């Protein structure tokens, strides 16, 4: 029964394979294997596009970052490219969607966010404590403002991860539901395929935008620690 097979649409996000060996998580190493330039004697078109994108993003991130150590921007560029490539590869049929899982996203966001927090406390803990009380706050609200600022500080990596996961999950679910709809109405197949191609193109751009948003917010958090 088709109803039984499609009863749980979220099964496509399960990190498991048919041979009872979770090989899907090895896909996270695929961008590192495919794109290193040391294996190219002559620069390929893909590497040319990647280098052009890296130069463009470096100039963009340099404006946002207030750090005097501009070399740190390379970390965020690498993170953005990794998330973008992983998001785009996950649109290929039967490819496991890594960045739809909070586990991977939380590892990326928590690691960087926590390192920024330690860096800020180590360098200037007085400034860190002063940020917990906004300027010109009433005295009777100071304790309450400290609690609010701490909560807003703690939920930052969670909001980053949930935003990325939710956008990817919603996009994949829409494509899946549209594919089920196409299989039930063969008579209007050309129109459905055109709509699905438009949604797929939109999902590709969404994957690029989400990787940019994820990285740019981390840069803003990093600039606060400086």
Swiss-Prot record:
Source taxon at top rank: Eukaryota
Pfam families in UniProt: ATP-synt_A
Transmembrane region(s): 22-42, 73-93, 102-122, 135-155, 173-193, 202-222
Bilayer topology: Multi-pass membrane protein
GO molecular function, a single term: proton-transporting ATP synthase activity, rotational mechanism
Cellular component terms (Gene Ontology): mitochondrial inner membrane; proton-transporting ATP synthase complex
Localization per record: Mitochondrion inner membrane
Described purpose of this protein according to its UniProt entry: Mitochondrial membrane ATP synthase (F(1)F(0) ATP synthase or Complex V) produces ATP from ADP in the presence of a proton gradient across the membrane which is generated by electron transport complexes of the respiratory chain. F-type ATPases consist of two structural domains, F(1) - containing the extramembraneous catalytic core and F(0) - containing the membrane proton channel, linked together by a central stalk and a peripheral stalk. During catalysis, ATP synthesis in the catalytic domain of F(1) is coupled via a rotary mechanism of the central stalk subunits to proton translocation.
Family: Belongs to the ATPase A chain family.
Protein name, as recorded: ATP synthase subunit a
Species in which this protein is naturally found: Apis mellifera ligustica
Lineage of producing organism: Eukaryota, Metazoa, Ecdysozoa, Arthropoda, Hexapoda
Gene: ATP6
């Amino acid at each position: 029964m088709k109803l039984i097979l499609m009863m749980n649409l979220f099964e496509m996000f399960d990190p498991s394979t048919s041979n009872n060996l979770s090989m899907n998580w090895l896909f996270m190493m695929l961008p590192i294997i495919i794109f290193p330039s040391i294996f190219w004697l002559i620069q390929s078109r893909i590497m040319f596009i990647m280098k052009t994108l890296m130069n463009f993003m470096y100039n963009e991130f340099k404006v946002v970052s207030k750090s005097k150590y501009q070399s740190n921007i390379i970390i965020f560029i690498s993170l953005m490219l990794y998330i973008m490539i992983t998001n785009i590869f996950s649109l290929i049929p039967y490819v496991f969607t890594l960045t739809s899982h909070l586990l991977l996203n939380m590892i990326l966001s928590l690691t960087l966010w926590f390192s920024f927090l330690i860096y800020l406390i180590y360098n200037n803990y007085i400034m860190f404590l002063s940020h917990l009380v906004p300027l010109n706050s009433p005295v009777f609200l100071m304790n309450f403002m400290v609690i609010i600022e701490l909560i807003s500080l703690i939920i930052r990596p969670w909001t980053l991860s949930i935003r990325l996961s939710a956008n990817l999950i919603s996009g994949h679910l829409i494509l899946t539901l549209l594919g089920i709809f196409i299989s039930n109405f063969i008579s209007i197949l050309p129109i459905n395929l055109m709509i699905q191609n438009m949604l797929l193109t939109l999902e590709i751009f969404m994957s690029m935008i989400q990787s940019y948003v994820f990285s740019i917010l981390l840069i803003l958090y990093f600039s606060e620690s400086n």
